[in-house]
Regions:
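Solvent-exposed interaction surfaces and binding hotspots enriched for charged
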Residues: 1-108
Length: 108
């Protein structure tokens, strides 16, 4: 769960901000605008960075550590989808219309 207490966030936030700025460096002049091509390159660098962080903090691999890490990565994916993708898709449904076959699943 990413909702850690404020003290833990305080310890991490400046490092995270610095890393994010470092990753963005050279990709965009304006943080509001990045091409899909540049974003693809940036995602590769994010993947590299996360892979190194995971490897360095895991120390020696074990089945249980690998299982826990893959579980956390899955949770990150699900939370991103729940918080970012789902609201975006709901906006698009309202603006462009729903898929007609899905109407039977709509909540009252």
């Amino acid at each position: 769960m990413p909702y850690i207490d404020e003290d833990a966030r305080f310890e991490l936030d400046s490092c995270i901000d610095e890393m994010a700025d470092c990753l963005m460096l050279g990709h965009v002049n304006n943080k509001e605008d990045i091409s899909n091509e540049e974003f693809t390159v940036l995602l590769g660098e994010i993947n590299y960075s996360f892979s190194r962080i995971i490897s360095k903090t895991m120390c020696e691999p074990s089945y249980s550590k690998i299982a826990m890490i893959t579980g956390v990565l899955e949770n990150i994916k699900q939370e991103f989808y729940r918080r970012v993708a789902e609201p975006y898709e709901n906006i698009k449904i309202r603006s462009n219309g729903d898929i007609k076959e899905y109407s039977k699943y709509t909540r009252p």
